[in-house]
Curated annotation (Swiss-Prot):
Placement of WD repeats on the sequence: 18-65, 70-109
Pfam families the record matches: ANAPC4_WD40
Keywords: Cell cycle, Cell division, Developmental protein, Meiosis, Mitosis, Neurotransmitter transport, Repeat, Transport, Ubl conjugation pathway, WD repeat
Annotated phenotype, changing M480I: In h1959ts; temperature sensitive mutant that can be maintained at 20 degrees Celsius, but that results in embryonic lethality at 25 degrees Celsius
Designated name of the protein: Abnormal embryogenesis protein 30
Function: Probable component of the anaphase promoting complex/cyclosome (APC/C), a cell cycle-regulated E3 ubiquitin ligase that controls progression through mitosis and the G1 phase of the cell cycle. The APC/C complex acts by mediating ubiquitination and subsequent degradation of target proteins. Developmental role in early embryogenesis and the metaphase to anaphase transition in oocyte and spermatocyte meiosis and mitosis in somatic and germ cells. Required for embryonic anterior-posterior axis formation. Negatively regulates ify-1 protein levels during meiosis I.
Pathway(s) per entry: Protein modification; protein ubiquitination
Gene Ontology terms: biological process: anaphase-promoting complex-dependent catabolic process; anterior/posterior axis specification, embryo; asymmetric cell division; metaphase/anaphase transition of meiosis I; negative regulation of gene expression; neurotransmitter transport; polarity specification of anterior/posterior axis; protein K11-linked ubiquitination
Gene Ontology cellular component terms for the protein in this record: anaphase-promoting complex; nuclear periphery
Highest rank taxon of the organism: Eukaryota
The organism of origin for this protein: Caenorhabditis elegans
Length: 1027
């Protein structure tokens, strides 16, 4: 079948604008006169078709759950929601953002793919009435009434929870003095909360499809927000021994009960039962293999429970964001408070160490003068009051917020997770009931979805860990508060504060556990871990230390008698020195053991501390038996060696047991007092307590738990995996063969569209069974084009079958061509601009002025190749093709064509006639780079000049056919303009205009096809006046 091309004005009111950036993607809104533009730098611009600015934003700084901000991501695809309220923007990093069209704010973000998303497609679900499906259950069901009632109940079950999430931080702003959300966090939470009403009106009953450009996958997002299913194209084709060559387009249709995608494959010739719309047979249609273009339909069951699941997924991500922001706020304010607490114990000098001061004060009741001065004046009563204030005011506030804000967020996550799993289980039961009528008669109850799905199990475990860590954080706050309270009580009773000690101080001392306070001071105020270990061994492990020392002495053959003799000789030498110094007798008993200790060790080659483990580390040869009393030789330092630089100054103390909860791993201080989970009920809780008590989970910080939970939340499509984590096999409901000829090698472009889009609600096709939800497949090669309509057999009533087949045949197109020359429409020929030999109509007696207009602009009037197809509604098409000119060296030009009428055609011949735009305003043609068509008001927009300019024009709803039925336009002659000029002079009194100048202007206007403006009066009246 051939088609023809006429040249006429199909694009009116063309306006060209310069874009603020190079456009990478664009789309029209189906409900408004809006156009959205995206750039490679992440900018999105929304304008009216009149080019009035609405808003501009950048989505690179918006992150989804489980992702980071990527400054180098570009906007790869755009698509408006069916009602035009939201704009879906996909990035090159696989993130989909939903933007509010009215405000330009990002309302929802989800990680949908691993790499670049190449295309988006957002459709409405158009279901048949429920009563029309009852006949399916009347053949093989034992109890029809029970099944019908069960299905009706499943269809009409109300949502069990429609409450809105209360903002916890709003209450904290009123009565919380320490921790508050920032304004940016508050705004982020408010704008990302999608209300139930908004969800019902705009997102429910919609399916958003996205293609992963790298992995050849289709991601199905229920309600545009919930990545419910992932269709692996390669795995799906592998079921039929096909390999993917090219993926063209995708489309969701509720009439076919699934997601359709169009692809060119290579493999056996399938026996497609496309008339019945059933899966192909096991045996191939013929021997051998070849290249085929096939339409695959993957089954997707839709139920009301699935929409509730999508709403629960939104609530789940909102709860995650609320917890993350609450944790960040709590962490930031906690760090400020703990720094203030530690600053109270800073002595500001290295000579006085608060740990040594407190330890000496506890053991001996006194310390040196500098230490007492710090306790009395540096810390003082004000310092103790601040510590007590922190322990009695700030710590309870932290506990309250941790238990209130964080615990509320954690419990909300647990609740939303439970509701999410419940809605999924309800949906799974519906599918099982729909596919298997023996469900009601099984003796064994079916396994819950959460028990058989590894993704749901992981989600439950991560949220439970987060809830447990939140509870532990509150317990750690209480523990720290008690420790600081005991510390303040003890310090207040030390010597520097004895003057203010009250009478009941002794009673307080009796109630205090001195051993625990001593251990607390050693572990928190001594920064060196080796020193802490040494002191703990001396104070609390003396028996063990003595036993080890005795054992070591036996192994080293330590001679105690020889050691005592040596001590005596050293003492004698020192005694003689003292006698010589004071010239008087000196009693040996007056010598203090502490004075002898350094002298004793000075005589030894290897000084030994009898209270440490150093004696146990000596060699077998005992140094105590050596008689050499000389000083040990010191190793000379090599000149090239530099002294080791001193490390960072260690903090005076570390009292924080809570701060590590905000990190990825808990500190040793937090683990020391970390409580254990009760394992009493593990028999009914699937050993939850024992899992929580494992070392790996105990060491986890909340930040790491959040990262793991984010990774789980960002991959809900794994819900279709089995227990082993492998993707379940998807069911292909039918395969439709488009082309399978021996010479076929694929198409240049292919599109799937609805014959009657959802916004054409009053079209007659909606009243005809089968045609209202039919789809159209349009494919083209360089020199071929075809378009077919596929009707869902389940929608066609027997009495309408012949009528439907007649409509399908009339909508079918199939063209082949080599070259097609463009013809001029008759109506356009009457109004065409004058050419070189026919510039204007003149009287025989009038003088003609020839004006040189320069080189003639080439006209591209020969179609040599097709490149793109844009299906509209009811058989209308817009094609993008490459045209050549008769002039040499002009190359090719990409131009658009449009079918001149839609179905049903008033004139049958108009079906195969396309119109190419003719510029009546004299403007030159521009090569089209990217073309989009408005689906309702049929505006056209195309990019040119490397995406830096955009042209928008109005397309006529229907181009006049070739037959001339419009009134012929009367063109003015040169004499008419001369008469108008004379009358203008008489009326205005202007006589200085050059006649030649005016004649040149008239000639240029007529050559360009334009009429000069006048005062609206006709020239016939002017002639009558002259007579």
């Amino acid at each position: 079948m051939d088609f023809s091309i006429v040249k006429t004005q199909i694009l009116n009111n063309r306006r060209t604008f310069r874009t603020p950036f190079k456009v990478s993607s664009m789309c029209f809104s189906s409900q408004n006169d809006l156009i959205a533009l995206g750039s490679k730098t992440g900018e999105i611009l929304l304008k009216r078709t009149s080019w009035k600015m609405i808003w501009k934003t950048n989505i690179n700084m918006i992150q989804a759950v489980g992702t980071e901000c990527k400054l180098d991501s570009s906007v790869s695809a755009l698509h408006f929601s069916p009602d035009g309220r939201f704009l879906a923007a996909a990035t090159s990093k696989g993130i989909i953002h939903l933007l509010d069209v009215e405000t330009g704010k990002v309302r929802f973000s989800v990680k949908a793919a691993s790499e670049k998303i190449a295309k988006l497609h957002w459709n409405c679900v158009r279901e048949k009435p429920f009563i029309s499906n009852l006949g399916e259950f009347t053949t093989r069901i034992k109890n029809v009434e029970a099944i019908e009632g069960a299905i009706e109940l499943a269809e009409t079950t109300p949502n069990i929870s429609q409450e809105e999430i209360a903002f916890v931080y709003q209450r904290l702003d009123e009565d919380g003095s320490s921790f508050k959300h920032e304004d940016a966090h508050k705004e982020s939470l408010e704008r990302t909360l999608i209300s139930t009403e908004t969800f019902r009106e705009s997102l429910q009953n919609t399916i958003l499809l996205a293609t992963d450009d790298m992995d050849s996958k289709i991601i199905v997002l229920v309600a545009g927000v919930f990545p419910y299913m992932e269709i692996d194209i390669s795995d799906t084709l592998l079921q039929y021994n096909q390999s993917l060559l090219m993926l063209y387009d995708m489309h969701y249709s509720s009439a076919f009960g699934g997601v359709s995608f169009l692809a060119t494959t290579y493999g056996p010739f399938l026996d497609c039962k496309q008339n019945e719309l059933k899966p192909p047979g096991a045996e191939p249609k013929k021997d051998g293999q070849g290249c085929h273009t096939l339409l695959f339909n993957v089954k997707l069951n839709i139920n009301s429970s699935l929409w509730d699941t999508a709403l629960r997924y939104i609530r789940l991500l909102f709860g995650f964001n609320l917890y993350s922001i609450s944790l960040e706020t709590t962490k930031r304010n906690w760090e400020e408070q703990i720094d203030n607490l530690h600053s109270l114990f800073d002595t500001k000098t290295k000579a006085v160490k608060i740990g040594n001061v407190l330890l000496e004060m506890l053991l001996s009741g006194s310390t040196d003068a500098a230490g007492e001065a710090f306790l009395e004046r540096g810390l003082g009563t004000d310092g103790l009051d601040k510590i007590e204030l922190f322990a009695t005011k700030h710590m309870p506030e932290v506990c309250r917020i941790a238990r209130g804000q964080l615990s509320t967020s954690a419990r909300n996550l647990c609740f939303q997770r439970c509701e999410f799993s419940t809605s999924l289980s309800r949906y799974a039961k519906f599918i099982q009931l729909k596919d298997d009528d023996s469900f009601l008669y099984d003796e064994d109850p079916p396994a819950y979805l959460s028990e058989s799905n590894i993704w749901l199990n992981t989600l439950e475990e991560k949220i439970n860990i987060l809830d447990m860590k939140t509870r532990h954080l509150g317990i750690q706050c209480l523990t720290m508060m008690q420790e600081l309270g005991h510390l303040v009580k003890w310090i207040s009773m030390t010597k520097p504060f004895a003057k203010t000690m009250k009478v009941n101080a002794l009673m307080k001392i009796k109630r205090m556990n001195i051993a625990k306070i001593l251990l607390y001071i050693v572990r928190n105020f001594i920064p060196d871990p080796e020193a802490v270990k040494d002191i703990e061994n001396r104070l609390f492990n003396l028996k063990e230390l003595v036993s080890k020392q005795k054992k070591k002495d036996l192994e080293d053959k330590f001679d105690e008698v020889e050691y005592l003799y040596r001590l005596e000789r050293i003492a004698e030498v020192e005694r003689k020195k003292l006698i010589e110094t004071f010239h008087e007798k000196f009693r040996f008993a007056d010598l203090d053991d502490d004075d002898l200790t350094p002298l004793l060790f000075q005589e030894l080659d290897h000084p030994i501390d009898i209270f440490t483990d150093s004696m146990m580390e000596q060699n077998d040869s005992s140094p105590f038996l050596e008689e050499d009393e000389g000083e040990p030789e010191q190793e000379e330092q090599k000149p090239d060696e530099e002294p080791e630089p001193e490390g960072e100054p260690q903090p005076a103390c570390d009292l924080d047991r809570v701060g590590s909860f905000f990190e990825k791993e808990l500190s040793q201080k937090a683990l020391e007092v970390l409580p254990k989970c009760d394992e009493t009920f593990d028999c009914v809780l699937n050993e939850r307590g024992s899992r929580m008590n494992s070392i790996e989970i105990q060491k986890m910080g909340i930040l790491r738990v959040l990262e793991d939970l984010a990774a789980t939340l960002s991959s809900p499509q794994k819900i279709h995996c089995d227990k082993a984590g492998n993707q379940k096999k998807l069911e292909v409901s039918f395969i439709y063969e488009i082309t399978s000829t021996p010479t076929h090698q694929g198409y240049q472009d292919a599109k799937i569209s609805s014959v009657t889009p959802s916004y054409y609600k009053r079209h007659p096709f909606n009243q005809l069974s089968g045609m209202g939800r039919s789809i159209q497949v349009s494919v083209l090669q360089k020199n071929e084009f075809s378009s077919i309509v596929i009707v869902p057999t389940s929608d066609v009533l027997p009495e309408d079958e012949n009528e439907v087949n007649d409509h399908v045949e009339k909508l079918k197109r199939c063209y082949e061509f080599e070259k097609i020359d463009v013809t001029v429409d008759k109506s356009s020929a009457e109004n065409r601009p004058p050419g070189e030999t026919d510039a204007m109509e003149v009287d025989s007696n009038e003088l003609r002025i020839d004006v040189d207009l320069g080189p003639v602009v080439p006209e591209y009037d020969t179609l040599i190749e097709l490149s793109q197809v844009h299906p509209l509604h009811h058989g209308e098409l817009v094609l993008l093709g490459k045209f050549t000119s008769a002039q040499e060296g002009t190359g090719v030009m990409s131009q658009m064509m449009r079918s001149i009428s839609s179905y049903p055609h008033e004139i049958p011949e108009d079906k195969d006639v396309f119109a190419k735009n003719s510029s009546e305003d004299g403007s030159s043609e521009i090569p089209i780079e990217t073309l989009i068509i408005h689906p309702t008001i049929q505006l056209a927009a195309y990019l040119h000049d490397d995406g830096s300019k955009i042209t928008i024009g109005d397309m006529k709803p229907e181009v006049p056919p070739i037959a001339d039925y419009e009134e012929k336009t009367v063109r003015k002659t040169f004499r008419d303009y001369q008469r108008r000029r004379e009358r203008y002079r008489e009326d205005m009194g202007v006589m200085n205009m050059n006649d030649v100048q005016y004649d040149v202007l008239v000639q240029e206007a007529m050559d360009s096809g334009r009429d000069l403006t006048d005062n609206g009066e006709s020239d016939e009246d002017e002639e009558d006046d002259d007579i």
